[in-house]
Design a protein with these regions (language model features):
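Radical SAM/AdoMet-radical enzyme domain recognition
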Residues: 1-55
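Auxiliary Fe-S-binding modules of radical SAM enzymes
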Residues: 43-47, 57-195
Length: 195
């Protein structure tokens, strides 16, 4: 985190203590930046009974952070964890509605999901998400710029049917695959897209 780690950890503990059912930890993999933190994150996740998701760096931010130097594919993260514990595939686990492939670590009991958006050619086949941006737009795909204005529809729709129609149209516009490998140029930071 670029913020106060103690505040982040306190927030996670508070969410668990408050009874939130779907607390998940996300970590964007960055070679040379956080690979030494993966095992402590696994231990923290195991201690608190939380799933940890390790996510490949994607070209989402408006700055150029995705480089060959700092990109770490999920298979490298898996190898780092295999040096500490055995990874047992859990193909039937669906913790949430995302494309993570989950494993349980034999000795720690940790649940770790790997999200290989850049290296898994079949990544998009299991994605059933749409994003709601901070300014009320529906984005059918994280890796595509197409958006529809849900906020305006909610303000001006005569009934729920118009909103349902907009959502159905947005879902139909969901592309078969993201555009990250092509000439994709980010236009919004992740904080504005919604994650």
């Amino acid at each position: 985190t670029s913020g106060d780690l103690n505040a982040v950890l306190a927030g996670i503990r508070a969410a668990v203590a408050a009874g939130f059912e779907r607390v998940k930890l996300n970590c964007v993999l960055m070679r040379g930046v956080n690979e030494q933190e993966l095992w402590p994150l696994v231990l923290f996740a195991a201690e608190h009974g939380l799933p940890l998701r390790l996510i490949e760096l994607m070209p989402i931010t408006t700055t150029d952070v995705l480089t060959e130097k700092n990109f770490m594919p999920v298979h490298e993260a898996m190898e780092l964890l295999r040096q500490k514990d055995e990874l047992i595939p859990q193909p039937d686990w669906r913790l949430g509605f995302g494309p993570a492939k989950y494993y349980q670590l034999k000795h720690t009991g940790a649940r770790v999901g790997f999200i290989g958006a850049m290296t898994n050619l079949h990544f998009c086949e299991t994605c059933n998400k749409m994003r709601l941006t901070a300014d009320g737009k529906i984005r059918p795909c994280l890796g595509d710029h197409g958006e529809m204005d849900l906020r305006e529809a909610l303000r001006h729709a005569p009934d729920d049917a118009a909103v349902r129609e907009l959502l159905a149209t947005a879902l139909q516009r969901k592309p078969l695959e993201h555009q990250f490998r092509g000439a994709y140029q980010p236009c919004r930071p992740m904080t504005a897209i919604g994650g």
